[in-house]
Each structure stands twice: as C-alpha cells, then as structure tokens.
Amino acid sequence: MKLDYNSREIFFGNEALIVADMTKGSNGKPEFTNHKIVTGLVSVGSMEDQAETNSYPADDVPDHGVKKGATLLQGEMVFIQTDQALKEDMLGQQRTENGLGWSPTGNWKTKCVQYLIKGRKRDKVTGEFVDGYRVVVYPHLTPTAEATKESETDSVDGVDPIQWTLAVQATESDIYSNGGKKVPAIEYEIWGEQAKDFAKKMESGLFIMQPDTVLAGAITLVAPVIPNVTTATKGNNDGTIVVPDTLKDSKGGTVKVTSVIKDAHGKVATNGQLAPGVYIVTFSADGYEDVTAGVSVTDHS
C-alpha cells in the first residue's frame, strides 16, 4: 500500500537535567532564577497521572457528567551520582560544617525541572537524517521522599555502581501555562537548525524552555498575497475577498490554516459583508507563528 506516513522519529538518551526557581514576573509570565544543572541522570520513570475520572449517570445516560480530578503526576528519577544541586536544591538537605556531608531535613523543595531526550528523524521527503531534542518540562515538581539506594559487596563477579532513586510528583503550575491553561508537564520537539540554536543558547547560559520561546531556524508560514477587490454593488457592504484555507511553509509544505479578518480599527469583519476600506487577515496554524496579509476593498463603480 502507498500510504503517506509522517517522518520516522526515535528518541534515546537523557541529558541536561536543569532545576530552577520560578516566580511570576511583572508581566505575568514566568521568571527563572538559580538555574543549576544536575549531573548523573540515568532515567525518568513513568510519570503516571493519579487523578481519577468519574462518570455520573442521570436519566438513561451513563455519562451525564464526567469529572476528572486535579492532575497529579507521580514517578521517579534515577541518578548514578548525587551532587550538590540534587541534595541541596531539590532534597533540601543541610550541608555539614566541614562541607563534606549532607543530612536530610524533610524540607523537599519544589522546582521547575527540565531535561532533554536526544532524538533523530528521517525526513520523509528528502530521506535525510535530522538530529534534535525532545525537551521535557515539569513546571512544579517536588520530591516526595529521600532518595533510596541499594549497595552490594564487591566480588570476583564485579559490582554494579550504586544508583539513587528519587520519588517525585508534578502538579499544575499557576505561573507556567500554555494558551492560558495550567499544565503539569509539557514536551517540545525541536529539530535541525532550531536544535542547533537551542544547544547554542543552552551552552551560553542555562534556560528553561517556554511556549513562546523563539529559536532561530524555525519553519514559518509564508504569508499569501490577497488580491484587492471591489464591493459587489455600489454603496453596499458586500465585499468578498479570497481567503485561502491552506498556506505554504518555508520548507514548501502545505499547512491547513484558520483566518480572522479585521478592519483598520481592529474590529473583526465578516467576509462577504466587507465595507470599502483596508483589512488585515491573520492566518494561524498549530506550531507556527501567525502571519498577516493586507487587502483593500473599494466601492463598486
């Protein structure tokens, strides 16, 4: 069968675990401070949603109402070493006077946590392999217990290195949101030139990815040229412009879009009922920056 599959992708290998403090800025957006990289991440266990979904029956409908509890993701992180960033900044441990040891306090700290998963995909058009990352962000993550470990005595068979397992939970953040909605977790996929720019930015200074973070090399929508028109009849508000429902992107792909027409005062207008004047059409698609096109409507002569 000849089917149009997407590009093939695989993800492998964790790296660059970053913890940071997050507060709400004066503009209402997240502000991050005290970025630290945590060394030794081995794996991240399944972050399972513990919230229950309940259906409430009424009349002859079994799901008259459906309610889901608040999202609570629980899982674990495994480390092959526990350094200062993990002990002090996540587990809230107290350093000893001589600087050589740490003791638990039970005062676990809530952090914004981000880590990367390396990825590779084969472009379905060119067949080329493209490297990238899946960026995983937990805006509001808290340990729920001290890190556990298991050690064994060395023998002729050798011994495995000790690994520390840290139980964690993630909840929705009042500050970090996507489209105005609070999220307990978010994942980004970045490829090619954007991935290179991401790595360059990260190497110049640790940062947390956000929904409005702009990276160089992004694939963008190509704004169309909309022909100017006249009204259907003289003196009436019955102008109709040609508004495409698909656009090309900067890579030549075809993208389905939605559009909104606004007049010179920013008021939404209805196609087919356009008065003489200048209009701006805004095109939107998931995963792309909006683009606009101008068009004018003149009165029928």
Curated annotation (Swiss-Prot):
Keywords: Viral genome ejection through host cell envelope, Viral long flexible tail ejection system, Viral penetration into host cytoplasm, Viral tail protein, Viral tail tube protein, Virion, Virus entry into host cell. The keyword Lipoprotein does not apply. The keyword Phosphoprotein does not apply. GO terms for biological process: symbiont genome ejection through host cell envelope, long flexible tail mechanism. GO terms for cellular component: virus tail, tube. It is found in: Virion. InterPro entries: L_lac_phage_MSP, L_lac_phage_MSP_N, Phage_tube_C. Forms the cylindrical rigid tail tube with a 4 nm wide central channel for DNA ejection. The tube is composed of 31 hexameric rings. Homohexamer. Interacts with the tail terminator protein. The C-terminus probably makes protruding decorations on the whole length of the tail tube. Belongs to the skunalikevirus tail tube protein family. This is Tail tube protein.
